């Protein structure tokens, strides 16, 4: 190799007159090749990771798009825990464990093919021996790992989901489990779920760690066998024997890491099959694209000037049971309407239909003669303010909580909404006022103040209609009375629809809709319904309302 004459025909422009210069040239060439190779591999790693991250981004974005834009009835089929699990966890595991490992597998297969291919050109026997070694190694490893990784694939997704559910159950219900003194029960459930999942993780880690040692043993055996073969073939030429043996050693030790990575990739691909299957099923069930996307920035509205009419509204979550049956009533501008009934009467479902979250199976809703449909309901929503039973408080400032969902925040409108909700005096005591941050779980706001914050959020957009869905059910009597008085004040400029099962909230309404088993029993004032219906009068007595 160091003979200058060997290179004279290939690089005549370089004068090589001794072995030292030749050695330096070879050294520089090898250095350049390795530097170039490593720069190229670094670039490939960057491209590969970017490709995988973009893929994860696209998949999670598709899921989020579906959960946000799809019809509300469709998204109700997936629980909140499963939605978080699909977006936050399963996508990363599936893409990293399957796609990323698949790319690593392909890269290392190419490396092995190139090494063996180059060997075949000049050294067919060592190349054949190397190919045989690779084939035998992969066969033996797959024979050992295939069934074992199949077991991982069948159980890993299930165990991981149980583990995540146990975490969520403990964290979300911390207050209740402390009151029940059930800390040990829930902790034991968590540790059991974690133990099962960690056992699977241990096996996966073990299977990932075994291949290097397994391949190293096979290399030693292969080298001993090759030494015997090459010695017999090149008995008359020691230099040829050394060269052939050196080439095989170099090839095997270069191929060995690639074989390790290939086997690790195969193990990870096999163990994440269930995650890939689940994400494919979820992706297919999403029916992406089968929904309309409306631009809220256009601020298109249906102006409410006179009357909203509900005609023969029927709805069911499944064909077996009808939740709403022929619901018909009118809402005049300026009305303070209460919808009353026991749990299961269909009150909240009716609110969801009024807001367009759920489409009625039959019947129609008219706003000043304009029929609402899925194509124009978004215009009607722009004049609606909605106050839920449980407010979602964000870990942001008060003004960001009030103006939630708006790109640009108007401080004057925030203050106006807070004053209308009778909360501004409380917030003004904070150091930074409406710019003060609310920390979830330790914000110091009472339940009544949180509900006022929800009302301020609903009032921020200056809606013409306010819908309260069981908004006072979690409040004590005094706070409920204060909010009811506040609603009386607001009702002078808004149309209010209040849904409740507590009569004290609705006594101030000018019209009450009494519901039972998905039907409207009657519509009238508080006194009229109390006089006509013993069931209603019994509710009055139970509520201790005089």
Tell me the role of every PLM-derived stretch.
Residues 388-437, 535-538, 544:
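Conserved "ABC signature" C-loop
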Residues 76-82, 155-203, 271, 276-279, ...:
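Loop segments that connect adjacent transmembrane helices in multi-pass transporters
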Residues 103-155, 225-240:
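Transmembrane helices of ABC transporter permease
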Residues 355:
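Helix-to-loop junction immediately C-terminal to a conserved catalytic motif
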Residues 1-36, 120-132, 236-242:
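Transmembrane helix-loop-helix hairpins at lipid-water interfaces of multipass membrane proteins
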Residues 68-114, 172, 196, 209:
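Juxtamembrane loop-to-helix connectors within ABC transporter transmembrane domains
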